[in-house]
């Protein structure tokens, strides 16, 4: 490509967010896309049938569109088939090859363990999946990419049905394991309750993320909080409506205030809408919150793209514009590729 698309109403141009405050030597605002596929299926499914990593052509298409980051979901069980065991060499090679392709295209990668705080369906912190096993996984994975400025560690996708104190203990153990082996990479820390911005201050799991997650401990002080936010009726992103646009934008503004009050930074790791006009308006408003608050936000990653999404998937931006998602891309286009320095993050330490 690239796809030169006419811009919709202008989105505020990005101001450089100091990613260097979180990832040494790298200053840019992350304008990302979730490239889905490696988290699909069940752990035992054959590669290429049950799951897939993004192809080189897909990665190049999104890089040419101006995206400078990819959130890369994958399954813990595939990479570490036995708790506390070695990483599977074949699966690790697939991840490393994908990272290299992203690097070749000038993109930062967020390694996203897409497991909802579970391993084979059992919660982290239970007898069969102790916190130490989660820390062990991150010790092993972080050693592979230690101090690569263009590799960010996303601790876990959307923990849920676990209390904030229990999740905090697991997150702190993983961060400690990462730092103990000498990896200084930026770490993205979610909360519980699906890490929704809308649920950040809610107490239906017990103490809120807002009251608990400020107690993250990182000896390198190189982390940011990851939240997700959708605009449909239940904030899940699974429905085609966008009836909660105002609530979603308000939630992001409230989370921005929490970030500023605690002198920390955030990352909007998932958000997206359908191509209905009112939904696109909400999409722009959510991007505006991040773009207008560069001291609080490192950036965002749209959900989603990837090789295996059906053409009729309502929120998906396809690498081939004929397959759908062009209206969402038009809405994001004004900030893609603007005021970023991808090359500064595209080096291995």
From Swiss-Prot:
Regulation: Is salt tolerant and retains more than 50% residual activity up to 15% NaCl.
Active-site residues, Swiss-Prot/TrEMBL: 158 (proton donor), 270 (nucleophile)
EC number assigned by the record: 3.2.1.4
Keyword line: Carbohydrate metabolism, Cellulose degradation, Glycosidase, Hydrolase, Polysaccharide degradation, Signal
UniProt keyword Signal present: yes
Top EC class, one word: hydrolase
Gene3D superfamilies hit by this protein: Glycosidases (3.20.20.80)
Any GO MF annotation of the entry: hydrolase activity, hydrolyzing O-glycosyl compounds
Record note on temperature dependence: Optimum temperature is 50 degrees Celsius with CMC as substrate. Retains 50% of its activity at temperatures ranging from 30 to 60 degrees Celsius.
One GO-annotated biological process of the protein: cellulose catabolic process
InterPro entries: Glyco_hydro_5 (IPR001547), Glyco_hydro_5_CS (IPR018087), Glycoside_hydrolase_SF (IPR017853)
pH dependence of activity: Optimum pH is 4.5 with CMC as substrate.
UniProt catalytic activity: Endohydrolysis of (1->4)-beta-D-glucosidic linkages in cellulose, lichenin and cereal beta-D-glucans
Family matches, as PROSITE patterns: GLYCOSYL_HYDROL_F5
Disulfide bridges in this chain: none
Family classification: Belongs to the glycosyl hydrolase 5 (cellulase A) family.
Protein name as annotated: Endoglucanase
Organism expressing this protein natively: Martelella endophytica
Gene: cel5A
